């Protein structure tokens, strides 16, 4: 699918802008209706003046999205360029974010979590087959296609994705709580970083809090580097051994021993009937509400500590700037708003 940048003097001649859906580091996302039709899109509006020095990030996102066509991945439908802006017309998904939907459910089981993870694994496996590493998988980037109960889950936000031309990538990228050990060590890394992030997401989906967290940045990084986490009682008492085994294979310290997406898809917790059908909504939703309140997990953070850690490992200034643009931070599980979270 080749999407050329279509030149326009005024985007309002192409789309009727309805309302603001959200905003990012250097863009706004608007609900827009295509002129002459009823078709709606999520229009990502990027001021060119905000792109100075960051052109490569956006060009990379476009290059990645042009290669993708998968039912569980938000599609790029069109690209427009005006004298002042670049516009990415994205497939509109209307079902809301992952945590919000879990909180709204009447019941929620391991089987539901397994089904969710299986869909995301399928999408990420597809990306990996194209040589694409997402690099920023986290719950906020998992959206439901529609508001209906049987809606599929969609992977979004490819701003940090990278086409892996060789065997490994080098720039530190991601979100601290989801970042793989090899990335923290500033070693060359590849597709396995996405599998690690899916391990963190799977863990959260089953208990409502993250596997790695601490008020101290060095301790947080130490936990990740050692792959040090627990299946705490009572939160994991009603979770199957199969689920725990699945997570252990995804949160494997050694990327060479870590499951690939294909191996994860074949695990019985995903492909078989090993997932329990017991309702865990009460405990999971309580923990999600405590640890991922919208005001916390939407909040951008100052990535000073992460970058200090990277500097100690000798990363180049160019890589450090890329990392600074990549970082997003969220709240420490179980802490009040007055405390300073480090995960």
From Swiss-Prot:
GO MF annotations, alphabetized: ATP binding; calcium/calmodulin-dependent protein kinase activity; calmodulin binding; protein serine kinase activity
Residues modified to Phosphoserine: 338
Localization per Swiss-Prot or TrEMBL: Cytoplasm; Nucleus
Record's function text: Calcium/calmodulin-dependent protein kinase belonging to a proposed calcium-triggered signaling cascade. In vitro phosphorylates CREB1 and SYN1/synapsin I. Phosphorylates and activates CAMK1.
Annotated region (Disordered), positions in chain: 314-343
Family: Belongs to the protein kinase superfamily. CAMK Ser/Thr protein kinase family. CaMK subfamily.
Name of this chain's protein: Calcium/calmodulin-dependent protein kinase type 1B
Domain of life: Eukaryota
Keyword Calcium: yes
Species assigned in the record: Mus musculus
Record text on activity regulation: Activated by Ca(2+)/calmodulin.
Active site per the UniProt annotation: 136
Gene: Pnck
Residues that, per the record, bind ATP: 21-29, 44
Cellular component terms (Gene Ontology): cytoplasm; nucleus
E.C. no: 2.7.11.17
Location of region: Calmodulin-binding: 290-311
